[in-house]
Amino acid sequence: MTDEAEHKDEGEARDPGARRSRATEGVRDWPESVERVSEAFRAAGAEARIEEFADGTPTAEAAAAAVGCELGRIVKSLLFDCDGSWVLVLVSGDRRADAAKVASATSSNRARVAGAAQVRDVTGYDVGAVAPVALARVSRILLDRRIPTQGTLWIGAGSPRHMAGLLASELARVTRAELVDVAEDT
């Protein structure tokens, strides 16, 4: 993913001075949670690029603006309590997860979005920074079928100031997510 021409229209920043980038190899000077994400990518042999954004990326909209990509190329990681099991749901930034569909996909009676304290406790990441890797207490990961299957996607990378860019095929492979319909219909 180091070929700039390959990414020209898929999420390159409009203001290169606003962010700092490095591949998942190299200098270790980022927060522990970001290093944990980087190590998970390395262990999986994934080609991913972690970037730091000075102003942070607290929402999907802010992330898309910082990265310079379409909102649909941002992947939100949402934690659900499904009858006592923790399930991470991945949906594109321009969609919302449908709790009824999550419950159905997990054969649960009810799926409830986790609160901020639960997200931190279960994932080890803060809300807005959840990476879909290095998740010891998550039993399943569901990937919405409407997430783009080609090109670069951007995910949380362990802190509100960090995002990881990787190919859509890498996201599915690295997370071992189940491809299902979990987004609200529009």
Regions found by a protein language model. Name each.
Residues 2-186:
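Extended, low-hydrophobicity, polar/charged segments
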